[in-house]
């Protein structure tokens, strides 16, 4: 049995988002309210934040990134994002992506309509991913989904339905790739 809480708080520090804070769709720039006047947002402000350790029970994984890699994330040189199969169906895959951000991508403000976010995300250079894929998913399919060309099987999920992979893009900047490879990953009970 797990219990979690999320708090909402508005900050006066340039409205920066704090860890654990809930973000409204208007703040994120994804509001469906037709009267909403905000038509743009800055995607780099909504990347996943650094933590001492990442625990994803629904993936059955926990991992620690190197301090240097976390510094790259804090400096917005790397964007950590998530991706998963449609939530209204049985889970087929779920993974976290680590992507190099240029100065332009870090500062970019995109239109929330017209596919602005998708264009921004597709322009990022993939370093690697950590995730799970339904058992017997081909490496060719994993490569297509993750935009990576090297896949290391970490193991099998505790429920034995998923293979866990650490994937990398050999074309990535070598110093970023080497730091990413220092990630410590552990399979835990999937909930």
Label the model's feature ranges.
Residues 121-125, 130, 139-144:
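Surface-exposed helix/loop patches within compact recognition domains
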Residues 142-158:
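Short, surface-exposed beta-strand/loop micro-motifs that present aromatic residues
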Residues 157-191:
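Surface-exposed amphipathic alpha-helical segments
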Residues 84, 99-101, 133-136, 167-172:
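Short, flexible beta-strand-to-coil junctions
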Residues 10-65:
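N-terminal, intrinsically disordered, polar/charged segments of Gram-positive cell-envelope systems
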Residues 4-7:
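C-terminal motif of bacterial Sec signal peptides marking the signal peptidase cleavage site
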Residues 59-127:
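Secretory pathway targeting signatures of secreted, lumenal, and periplasmic proteins
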């Amino acid at each position: 049995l797990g219990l979690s809480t999320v708090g909402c708080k508005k900050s006066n520090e340039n409205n920066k988002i704090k860890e654990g804070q809930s973000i409204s769709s208007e703040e994120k720039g994804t509001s469906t309210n037709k009267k909403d006047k905000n038509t743009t947002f800055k995607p780099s402000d909504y990347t996943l934040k650094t933590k001492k350790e990442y625990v994803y029970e629904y993936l059955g994984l926990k991992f620690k990134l190197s301090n240097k890699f976390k510094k790259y994330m804090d400096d917005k040189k790397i964007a950590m994002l998530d991706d998963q199969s449609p939530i209204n169906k049985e889970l087929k895959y779920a993974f976290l992506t680590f992507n190099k951000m240029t100065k332009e991508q870090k500062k970019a403000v995109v239109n929330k309509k017209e596919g602005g976010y998708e264009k921004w995300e597709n322009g990022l250079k993939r370093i690697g991913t950590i995730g799970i894929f339904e058992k017997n998913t081909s490496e060719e399919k994993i490569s297509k989904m993750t935009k990576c060309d090297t896949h290391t099987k970490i193991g099998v999920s505790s429920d034995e339905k998923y293979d866990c992979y650490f994937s990398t893009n050999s074309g990535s900047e070598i110093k970023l790739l080497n730091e990413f490879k220092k990630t410590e990953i552990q399979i835990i009970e999937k909930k």
